[in-house]
Amino acid sequence: SIMSMANLEIEQAAGSNDAWFVRRGAGTPQDGLAALFRLMGVAEASPHATAPITTRRVRAGVALFHEGTCAQAVYFIAVGTFKLMHTAEDGYEQVLGFAGRAEMLGYDALCQRSYPTTAVALEDSTVYALPVADLFGLSARVPALGRVLHLAASRQMLHQVEIAHLIGLGA
C-alpha cells in the first residue's frame, strides 16, 4: 500500500508488515543523496546531491535481504545494526559478521547478481537504498557517489582483514 504525506511516500514492502520504504522528494538539503554523503563524511556541492534516494526502515528481527535472492539494491546503514549470516544446506545459520552506522550492505552481490548472505536487523533500523540498476549510471553523473562507494568498499575490506587477523591469532 502507498500513502502520500507532504512530499513523503510510504510504501509497505510486499508481503510484509515489518518493513517499509520511505521515498523523500527532492527539494531540501536534507533530502536525497546529500544525506548519504553526510553520513559517509563526503562533501559534495553538486546539484545532483538533492536527487531523491529511497530510505528503507526495517524492524528488529526482519531481513533486509535474503541469501540467494536477486540483488535489487546496495544499502547504507543510517541507523541501526545488522547481522550478516549464511545458511548451510542443513539449515545451520552461521553468523559472518555485523554491520552498523555508515556501513554498506549488499555491495558484494554486484559480481554475482544475488546476495551471498542474509542481513537481519538486530534493532529497528534505517538504510538508504541505491537500486543496482541505477548504481553505475548515477555514479557516473555524481562523482561523489563513486567516492562514497569506494570509501565504503575500502572500509569493508579493512574490516575483513581485521577479522582475518583476529581469527589467525585465535582471539
PLM features per residue range, with description:
Residues A140-A171:
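Polybasic "coupling" helices that flank or enter modular domains
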Residues M104, L135-F136:
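A generic structural signal for short hydrophobic patches within well-formed alpha-helices
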Residues Y128:
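Conserved active-site beta-strand element of glycosyltransferases/polysaccharide synthases
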Residues L110-C111, L122, L138-V142, I163:
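Residue-level signal for well-ordered alpha-helical positions
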Residues I2-A60, E103-L105, A109-L110, R141:
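Cyclic nucleotide-binding regulatory module and flanking cytosolic helices
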Residues V62-E123:
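Cyclic nucleotide-binding regulatory domains
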